[in-house]
């Protein structure tokens, strides 16, 4: 199998990288998991309950859970893993603000005691990036220090002898894994492994990967490049399959701390300037795999809505954008756009953005570098003259928009937030209510209010939504389609 | 000669030290942050800062440098930031594929290239010379990835005679090992073969016009004896230099072929390490490749004594 990007970091807790999360899903297990409808289901947990005052959750582990080294999974492992995960993952950090104590009661039972009720606790424990349960001795290490022992309790075992980091990773079926009896459903249900071994190959060249798929040397390419899709589609031995139907959202972050985007009018100018179809065409080519997006809360999610989306119209509106930029007091300051040279889609969209900005009179400079250079530079809050930046394009999963309480892209808490650092106290007070909302309807109403405010302050701009088809040989079946990560249980290789 | 070898060995250490200092400083000055690469696309600045602190990347550069030199002198090239394994272990995993490919390429390039060069010089100006010179020019001009994909299409996809990609260690059997290396070796050999053929032709042409060649012909020496025993031996020094330097270049520079054929060699290791900002691996590989380069040069210099008895060290 060839993953979208090769496994770099083994510790899925210390990183948000998607491939590391897929690695985590293979070798680790989780307390809860999301099913295909994104509902929370118990996974390692057999049963759980909440006290009458809604402040103490008790969790009991199911029978048969064991580490790959032969020892049993205990409640102490879970307690240490939750604490470690909460050090770095936004959901955990949020939860810990309300936690009074996490402690084990006996070998199979632990509790989370809260200072005040937190109805979304199971959702937080099940949210992405997942809370992977590690051995206590591994989980006692700081979350900023990578755990590379690769010993979990999941349905696959990491084969250290055959794995060559950076070249190939080998997983063997964990014969001792006891799956739940339910049918596999999303990340939840019975994790039944139908293959003896899975090998991830690091085939860097897409053409080689395709040739290997065609020759039957590999069975799966998670993210084939756009130019290969028509060729794959025409091959009767191969099939394109969209596993993450929600897809991802290409988005533009603006440095709200520096000129000109510290002025809301200049950010609104960008919102009006962007013709999503043109950007999607430049980035992805085939309309079959992209669509426009107007709701802050993604396409086709429970919270998608049309509040305050009047700025959107087919074809963009450069005249309005030009007027707004002028009204913002823009005086020709240099706008630096970070351009990732090793991410073709984003690079193409970046060049289009530069061209569109120049058309409305902006003084634009592209700053090309590989993604490694961008992730360092995007952290700089200062002006472009001091090595800062004005704009960069990234993406997030459509699904993540349903979790505004944990998705840092959707925050507007200034310097405490994510790159771009938009600030809106009004929006943040609305976002804080998300945790208090008790029903879906309440959250839907809240989503409309949040969106109304957000498209006024324009904390970021959506450039469009896209799905990434995967390519597989017809003989590989049973792949589970979920956002971003690839579970490997349930899949099987049939003859032919 | 012993003194010469010892002196050269000392110079090898000096070169490795200079490469080490240069690479260390260059990496710290270049944009990019391994902590950010570990943390992933959506990580917060706070988490990245925590990882930087944990990895010691916030220490002043001189402190990091002294720590690194101390470890190197103790034989510890460090641990990969991402894989969490010793750098030497990772390099040793990747050496076999690269050395296998480099050695096979050099054997094929040198054998065929020298033969082509001799033939072209022997029949200088004739049809054979024109064909071989044309081939050499073509060999230089066509990028290796084009040749690679062309070979993959015919010999792996159309006929299924050979695998598309991958590498099998020699311990898994000679044939599986060889089968996986045939296409990459041919691909990589073509430019080197062309280069060696041209150098051999030029050297041979120079020697063939010497007086002693006319003397050998007057003595009634056979064409084979004249070409191989008289001419080739005297034309050998520049050919050996080219072969030696090509081999040294191959060990550190086969990244395109390794990428096209998905061979997990040293070239791929260092390119991935650069993309990930995995400093210990980049530093380790470059120092070792520099050392290897100097040693191969030494071996080439010493081999001159085999073809030219006038050379003494």
Predicted regions and their residues:
Chain B
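An internal, D/E-rich "acidic patch" concept
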Residues: 58-114
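Hydrophobic alpha-helical membrane-insertion segments
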Residues: 16-21, 138-150, 243-248
């Amino acid at each position: 199998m060839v993953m979208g990007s090769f496994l770099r970091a083994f510790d899925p807790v210390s990183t948000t990288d998607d491939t590391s999360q897929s690695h985590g899903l293979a070798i680790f297990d989780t307390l809860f998991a999301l099913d295909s409808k994104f509902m929370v289901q118990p996974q390692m947990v057999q049963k759980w309950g909440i006290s009458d005052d809604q402040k103490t959750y008790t969790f009991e582990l199911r029978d048969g859970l064991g580490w790959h080294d032969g020892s049993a999974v205990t409640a102490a492992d879970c307690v240490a893993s939750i604490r470690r995960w909460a050090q770095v993952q936004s959901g955990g950090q949020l939860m810990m603000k309300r936690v009074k104590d996490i402690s084990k009661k006996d070998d199979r039972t632990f509790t989370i005691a809260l200072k005040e009720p937190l109805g979304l606790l199971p959702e937080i424990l099940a949210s992405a990036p997942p809370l992977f349960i590690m051995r206590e001795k591994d989980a006692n290490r700081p979350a900023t220090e990578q755990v590379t022992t690769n010993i979990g309790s999941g349905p696959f075992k990491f084969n250290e002898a055959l794995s060559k980091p950076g070249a190939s990773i080998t997983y063997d079926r964990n014969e001792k894994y006891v799956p739940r009896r339910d049918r596999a459903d999303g990340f939840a249900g019975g994790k039944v492994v139908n293959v003896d071994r899975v090998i991830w190959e690091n085939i860097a060249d897409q053409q080689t990967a395709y040739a290997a798929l065609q020759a039957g040397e590999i069975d799966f390419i998670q993210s084939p490049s756009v130019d290969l899709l028509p060729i794959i589609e025409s091959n009767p031995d191969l099939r394109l399959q969209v596993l993450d139907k929600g897809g991802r959202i290409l988005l533009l972050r603006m440095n709200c701390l520096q000129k000109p985007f510290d002025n809301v009018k200049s950010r609104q100018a960008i919102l009006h300037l962007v013709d999503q179809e043109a950007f999607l065409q430049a980035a992805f080519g085939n309309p079959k795999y992209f669509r426009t997006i107007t709701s802050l809360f993604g396409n086709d999610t429970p919270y998608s809505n049309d509040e305050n989306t009047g700025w959107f119209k087919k074809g963009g509106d450069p005249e309005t954008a030009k007027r707004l930029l002028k009204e913002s007091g823009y005086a020709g300051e240099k706008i630096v756009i970070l351009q990732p040279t090793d991410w073709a889609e984003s690079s193409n969209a970046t060049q289009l953005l530069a061209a569109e900005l120049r058309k409305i009179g902006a003084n634009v400079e592209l700053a090309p570098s590989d993604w490694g250079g961008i992730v360092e530079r995007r952290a700089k809050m200062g002006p472009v003259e001091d090595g800062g930046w004005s704009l960069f394009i990234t993406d997030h999963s459509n699904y993540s928009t349903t979790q505004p309480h944990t998705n840092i892209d959707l925050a507007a808490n200034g310097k405490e937030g994510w790159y771009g650092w938009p600030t809106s106290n009004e929006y943040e007070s609305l976002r804080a209510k998300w945790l208090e909302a008790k029903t879906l309807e309440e959250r839907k109403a809240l989503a409309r209010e949040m969106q109304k405010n957000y498209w006024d302050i324009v904390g970021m701009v959506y450039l469009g939504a896209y799905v990434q088809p995967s390519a597989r040989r017809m003989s590989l079946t049973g792949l589970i389609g979920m956002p971003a990560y690839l579970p490997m249980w349930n899949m099987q290789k049939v003859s032919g | 000669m012993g003194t010469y070898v010892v002196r050269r060995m000392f110079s090898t250490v000096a070169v490795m030290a200079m490469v080490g200092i240069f690479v260390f400083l260059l990496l710290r000055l270049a944009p990019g942050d391994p902590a950010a690469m570990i943390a992933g696309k959506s990580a917060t600045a706070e988490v990245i800062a925590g990882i930087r602190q944990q990895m010691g990347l916030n220490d002043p550069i001189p402190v990091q440098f002294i720590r690194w030199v101390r470890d190197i002198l103790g034989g510890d090239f460090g641990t990969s930031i991402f894989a969490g394994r010793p750098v030497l272990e990772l390099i040793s995993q990747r050496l076999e594929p690269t050395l296998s490919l480099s050695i096979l390429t050099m054997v094929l390039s040198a054998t065929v290239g020298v033969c082509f060069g001799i033939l072209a010089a022997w029949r200088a100006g004739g049809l054979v010379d024109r064909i071989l010179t044309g081939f050499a020019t073509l060999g230089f001009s066509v990028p290796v990835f084009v040749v690679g994909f062309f070979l993959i299409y015919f010999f792996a996809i159309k006929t299924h005679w050979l695998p598309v990609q991958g590498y099998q260690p020699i311990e898994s059997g000679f044939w599986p090992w060889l089968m996986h290396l045939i296409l990459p070796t041919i691909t990589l050999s073509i430019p080197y073969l062309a280069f060696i053929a041209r150098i051999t032709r030029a050297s041979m042409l120079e020697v063939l016009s010497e007086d002693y060649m006319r003397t050998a012909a007057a003595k009634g020496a056979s064409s084979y004896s004249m070409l191989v025993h008289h001419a080739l031996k005297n034309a050998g020094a520049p050919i050996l230099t080219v072969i030696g330097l090509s081999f040294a270049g191959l060990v550190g520079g086969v990244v395109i072929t390794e990428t096209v054929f998905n061979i997990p060699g040293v070239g791929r290791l260092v390119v991935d390490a650069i993309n990930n900002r995995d400093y210990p691996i980049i530093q380790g590989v470059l120092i070792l490749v520099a050392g290897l380069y100097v040693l191969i040069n030494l071996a080439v210099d010493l081999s001159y004594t085999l073809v030219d008895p006038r050379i003494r060290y």
